[in-house]
Structure formats: C-alpha cells, structure tokens
C-alpha cells in the first residue's frame, strides 16, 4: 500500500513538472519577438508604442541596437532594430520611447493578416470603412500609381494611432504602425 502511494506521488510530481515546463515554454515563446509576431496599431508582439528601448528589449527577449541615421541625442529621433533575427523590423524612437514600428519583412503580418505583397483591394476588405487612401508622395504617378492606405481606427481609445500601408503598382511594399505624428513622417527620422 505504501509503495502504491509513493508511486502515485512520483507520477503526480512528474506530471506536474511536465505541465509546468509546457506552460513556461509556451509563455516564453509567445513573449519573444519573431517573424510570427503580429503587427497591431500600437506595436508588434510584446513591444508596445511608448516603451523605453530597454523595456522593449526585455519584453521581447531580444537585444535592440541602434541603426541607420538619426540624431545622436537620445531624446531626438533614431531607429533601433533587433540584433540578428527577426530581420525587416525597425523601431522609431522619439523622446526616448518607441513611437512607431516599420515593417519590410514579407513574412510579418498585421493582426488581421495584411502583409507585403497584398493588393490594395485585400487591404480594403480586411479593414472595411477604415482605410483612407491618399497619393504616395513619391510614386503616385503612372506606372507606379502608389498610395498610402491609412487605417484610421474606429475605437476612440486608438484615435492617436495608425497603420499605414505603402503601395506601388497596386501592391503593398512596406507598412508601419504607431502614434501620431511620428507614424506619418514620410522619411522616418530624416
């Protein structure tokens, strides 16, 4: 009788340990920034607009490094990107905080499934009644006929955020999300 109880106890402990490991692995996999992370109107995966760079790095389980041009003053405008993977994600930083997320990776999608390569009609169908189309400032003339397809949210809580899809020849070439006014800066920090 005593062996049976200790066998049950061992089985229970092993079962509990396995469940715990599965849960921990699942939670940590969800928290890490990857190509499977979804772009939202206010961030991507675990990174949110308004986070400090160190906070975003810890939240996403990655190291963010400074990239490209921008002012050397940390309270002005500059970009950071993941060191290593995932590629094709850049975070604009203004006043020491993440202000927008720029996507050039074809594998990354929005929460609704929009991605690079989608045609304009698909974007319109994913966000019915929420897209404002304007001419692209650089490629609006034929043959490119480029546009900015800007998601203007219906929810009052999101009124200061946008997702902007840049198109050329009827296809999304890149997209970004973030807060106003930074999300609308045509040339990033330039």
Residue ranges and their predicted role:
Residues 25-30:
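Sec/Tat signal peptide C-region and signal peptidase I cleavage site
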Residues 188-190:
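Short, solvent-exposed mixed-charge patches
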Residues 31, 51-94, 115, 120-186:
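A cross-family detector of function-defining hotspots
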């Amino acid at each position: 009788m005593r062996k049976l109880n200790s066998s049950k106890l061992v089985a229970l402990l092993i079962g509990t340990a396995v469940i715990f490991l599965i849960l921990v692995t699942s939670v940590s996999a969800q928290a890490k920034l990857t190509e499977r992370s979804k772009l939202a109107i206010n961030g991507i995966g675990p990174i949110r607009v308004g986070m400090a760079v160190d906070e975003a790095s810890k939240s996403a389980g990655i190291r963010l490094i400074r990239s490209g041009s921008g002012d050397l003053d940390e309270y002005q405008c500059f970009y950071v990107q993941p060191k290593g993977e995932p590629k094709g994600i850049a975070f604009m930083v203004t006043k020491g905080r993440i202000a927008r997320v720029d996507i050039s990776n074809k594998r990354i999608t929005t929460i609704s499934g929009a991605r690079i390569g989608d045609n304009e009609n698909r974007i319109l169908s994913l966000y019915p009644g929420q897209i404002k189309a304007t001419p692209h400032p650089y490629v609006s003339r034929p043959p490119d006929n480029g546009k900015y397809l800007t998601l203007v949210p219906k929810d009052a809580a999101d009124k200061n955020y946008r997702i902007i899809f840049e198109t050329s020849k009827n296809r999304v070439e890149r997209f970004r999300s973030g807060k106003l006014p930074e999300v609308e800066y045509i040339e990033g920090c330039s």
